[in-house]
Amino acid sequence: MTDLTLAALKTAPLAQVRQYLLHLLATHAYKEGDFILSSGQPSTYYINGKLVTLRAEGALAIGRLLLTELPDQVEAVAGLTLGADPIVSAVSTVSAYEEKPVVALIIRKEAKGHGTKAYIEGPELAPGTKVVVLEDVVTTGKSAMLAVERLRNAGYQVDTVISLVDRQQGGREFYQSQGLTFQALFTIGDIQQVYRQK
């Protein structure tokens, strides 16, 4: 099912929510053309996840799906600004409705130049707190790895990275080489298949 109202999206079975989100990504976020990725690599397609993650219905679907993917005892989700900001917020908000509260943390690329000069925005958590890093799109894996390193340097335990989309260009293998578990809701092939059926 690719057409759900917001009311239905709140309670629809997760398999339907997953198909709905896949349709949103293929319809609104996926573009073909000539692009340069943040990794510096050229590409014939681009996924602008924010065109879905910043929609109310996209955020709700993402929050519901990713919350169910979190390992046990996870107390927080985090991600590198800007792409992960709406994702961690969506998961945290849905977690409150599900009565399984998860804190959202936002990781800066550069330390704030004023005030606390912090790399990590959000509530301060106890050392050893289990945190999962969330990402919109993974290519090489280097962007989310910066978030992992910042969190570990702050004393948090990070073992898992979860992405909405895996471009299948080495990110999974990179995370495995770093001792991290990696999951993605969709592969680029999933999105391209739906895109080409439009």
From Swiss-Prot:
EC number(s) per entry: 2.4.2.10
Pathway(s) where this gene product acts: Pyrimidine metabolism; UMP biosynthesis via de novo pathway; UMP from orotate: step 1/2
Residues reported in the UniProt entry to bind orotate: T139, R167
SUPFAM superfamilies per record: PRTase-like
Residues bound to 5-phospho-alpha-D-ribose 1-diphosphate: R108, K109, K112, H114, E135, D136, V137, V138, T139, T140, G141, K142, S143
Domain of life of the source: Bacteria
GO annotation terms (biological process): 'de novo' UMP biosynthetic process; pyrimidine nucleobase biosynthetic process; UMP biosynthetic process
Cofactor(s) essential for the protein: Mg(2+)
Job of this protein: Catalyzes the transfer of a ribosyl phosphate group from 5-phosphoribose 1-diphosphate to orotate, leading to the formation of orotidine monophosphate (OMP).
Quaternary structure and partners: Homodimer.
NCBIfam families, per database record: pyrE
UniProt record similarity statement: Belongs to the purine/pyrimidine phosphoribosyltransferase family. PyrE subfamily.
UniProt-recorded name of the protein: Orotate phosphoribosyltransferase
Organism: Synechocystis sp. (strain ATCC 27184 / PCC 6803 / Kazusa)
